[in-house]
């Protein structure tokens, strides 16, 4: 049975993936396509609704993104948001002007709640605006259904053609009625049922992988992270022992992480699981290297060599599992999967290793990947594992790497994670970790002078890692973490907490 589909047309706005996630929260499947995507291709996908996103351009600029008027003849409801609202109005004969006063942030708006778009929503609401242009009058046949102090045409509708536009951003949390408005569009205007669920996704994916793989062999480069673990589990459910997972333990993992991954996938789920202990090999290559980009390159290249050696031992392999998720697809503009000779997650596989790619998660956002993991019975602790960079602790130990520095960082990080979990903050904070900034400072311990390392703690709140704010961890939790690390981790006498947002800082220190 063909599933319901909403197309999100991307005009370059910062919230575009968030729009798609909001649609999927309503159990409606949607895909993001660039504004250059042809109307014929959109028609072929047979969407039940179309959403135009925001964007950074002005619609009256010569080089501003445009779209063919033919899209309105497909005959399905269309909703324009911010730039999308302005684009609908200018394309169909309305007028957009540059505003004297910019509307940015929380804005009061008056809505016509007799419109189906605003059904069940109060007349006077607050919303999130972010624009310097405004619609000064709507196209012929359109009715104004919303206005604000600086936007006389903050929302429009053409009931006959089922075309709607809003100047504000319903997808963000700062628009309290936004989820209800999107729900109205999906279920009352597009007449969708909401047939997208993780259980149906898993069933469909297992069936399609079985058909594609047949009796051939499959390998997966497993990192122990959420994406590769869930991807491997789906393929294992489909083809069983035809899948072999290769777990390269480079000695740069968090405390006990390698053992936990092996216990789950080899012992609990009975997978073909090869763990390669390559710690000495990696540390030798990283000796005296302090530049973070050089570290990344060395680790990536060595990973390829180890993976190649192990893969060749398995004989002829037809397929490679990759944990690509939907944001990767959107941000890189990837098309349909094809036979590849590179694997972007591990820096590129050797040219003589040809695999057909299996990307079971390429349609999913991160929260959906976690939901699939739970559906498949992967332990909750692994499904909610913290994001962890491919180079591991190599980029959380600033400067050159030694076994001593790695152990200090590993032990400090374990204490931090343990106390965050005890405080029931582990699923509300997006990412939290300890790093070693390669700073020594003077201290006093037991009436003696010390000259030891400093540990920096980093914890951030985010939804997508594109932007983040530092987490306001209760002082008593930070106090306990600090005292435990100083007392339990040899070689540390000072703890600092990073209170920088992204931007200007990145989440990781290197």
Swiss-Prot record:
Active site: 82, 169, 171
Pfam families: GATase, GMP_synt_C, tRNA_Me_trans
Domain GMPS ATP-PPase: residue ranges: 196-385
Involved pathway(s): Purine metabolism; GMP biosynthesis; GMP from XMP (L-Gln route): step 1/1
First-level EC class: ligase
Record field: catalytic activity: XMP + L-glutamine + ATP + H2O = GMP + L-glutamate + AMP + diphosphate + 2 H(+)
Boundaries of every Glutamine amidotransferase type-1 domain copy: 5-195
Binding site for ATP: 223-229
GO cellular component, one term: cytosol
Known EC number: 6.3.5.2
Keywords from the named record: ATP-binding, Glutamine amidotransferase, GMP biosynthesis, Ligase, Nucleotide-binding, Purine biosynthesis
InterPro entries, sorted: Class_I_gatase-like (IPR029062), GATASE (IPR017926), GMP_synth_C (IPR001674), GMP_synth_GATase (IPR004739), GMP_synthase (IPR022955), GMPS_ATP_PPase_dom (IPR025777), Rossmann-like_a/b/a_fold (IPR014729)
Keyword field contains Ligase: yes
One example GO MF annotation: ATP binding
PROSITE patterns reported in the protein's UniProt record: GATASE_TYPE_1, GMPS_ATP_PPASE
Highest taxon in the source lineage: Bacteria
Family annotation (HAMAP family): GMP_synthase (MF_00344)
Subunit structure: Homodimer.
Free-text function comment from the UniProt entry: Catalyzes the synthesis of GMP from XMP.
Identification of the protein by name: GMP synthase [glutamine-hydrolyzing]
Native species: Clostridium kluyveri (strain ATCC 8527 / DSM 555 / NBRC 12016 / NCIMB 10680 / K1)
Organismal lineage: Bacteria, Bacillati, Bacillota, Clostridia, Eubacteriales
């Amino acid at each position: 049975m063909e599933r319901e589909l909403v197309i999100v047309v991307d005009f370059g706005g910062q919230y575009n993936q968030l729009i798609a996630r909001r649609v999927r929260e309503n159990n409606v499947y949607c895909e993001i396509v660039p504004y250059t995507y042809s109307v014929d291709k959109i028609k072929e996908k047979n969407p039940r609704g179309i959403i135009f996103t925001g964007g950074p351009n002005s619609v009256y600029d010569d080089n501003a993104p445009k779209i063919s008027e033919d899209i309105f003849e497909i005959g399905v409801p269309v909703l324009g948001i911010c730039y999308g609202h302005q684009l609908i109005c200018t394309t169909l004969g309305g007028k957009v002007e540059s505003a004297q006063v910019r509307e940015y942030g929380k804005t009061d708006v008056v809505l016509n709640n007799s419109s189906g778009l605003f059904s069940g929503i109060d007349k006077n609401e607050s919303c999130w605006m972010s624009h310097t242009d405004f619609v000064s009058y709507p196209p012929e046949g359109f009715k104004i259904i919303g206005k604000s102090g600086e936007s006389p045409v903050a929302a429009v509708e053409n009931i006959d053609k089922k075309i709607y536009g809003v100047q504000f951003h319903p997808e963000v949390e700062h628009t309290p009625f936004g989820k209800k408005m999107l729900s109205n569009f999906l279920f009352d205007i597009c007449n969708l049922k909401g047939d997208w669920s993780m259980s149906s996704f898993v069933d469909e994916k297992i069936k399609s992988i079985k058909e594609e793989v047949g009796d051939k062999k499959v390998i997966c480069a497993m990192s122990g992270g959420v994406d590769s673990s869930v991807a491997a589990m789906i393929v294992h459910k489909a083809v069983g022992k035809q899948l072999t997972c290769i777990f390269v333990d480079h000695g740069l993992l968090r405390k006990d992480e390698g053992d936990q991954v092996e216990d789950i996938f080899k012992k609990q789920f009975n997978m073909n699981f090869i763990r390669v202990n390559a710690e000495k090999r990696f540390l030798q290559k990283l000796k005296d290297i302090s530049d973070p980009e050089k570290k990344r390159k060395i680790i990536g290249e060595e990973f390829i060599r180890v993976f190649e050696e192990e893969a060749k031992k398995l004989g002829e392999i037809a397929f490679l599992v990759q944990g690509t998720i939907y944001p990767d697809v959107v941000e890189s503009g990837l098309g349909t999967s094809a036979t590849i000779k590179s694997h972007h997650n591990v820096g590129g596989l050797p040219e003589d290793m040809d695999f057909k790619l299996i990307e079971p998660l390429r349609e999913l956002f991160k929260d959906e990947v976690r939901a699939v993991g739970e559906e498949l019975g992967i332990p909750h602790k692994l499904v909610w594992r913290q994001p962890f960079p491919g180079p591991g602790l190599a980029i959380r130990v600033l400067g050159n790497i030694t076994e001593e520095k790695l152990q200090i960082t590993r032990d400090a990080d374990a204490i931090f994670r343990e106390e965050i979990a005890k405080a029931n903050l582990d699923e509300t904070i997006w990412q939290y970790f300890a790093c070693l900034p390669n700073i020594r400072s003077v201290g006093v311990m037991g009436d003696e002078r010390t000259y030891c390392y400093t540990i920096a703690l980093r914890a951030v709140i985010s939804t997508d890692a594109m932007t983040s704010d530092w987490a306001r961890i209760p002082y008593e939790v930070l106090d306990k973490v600090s005292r435990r690390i100083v007392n339990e981790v040899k070689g540390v006498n000072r703890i600092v907490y990073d209170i920088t947002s992204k931007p200007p800082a990145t989440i990781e220190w290197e």
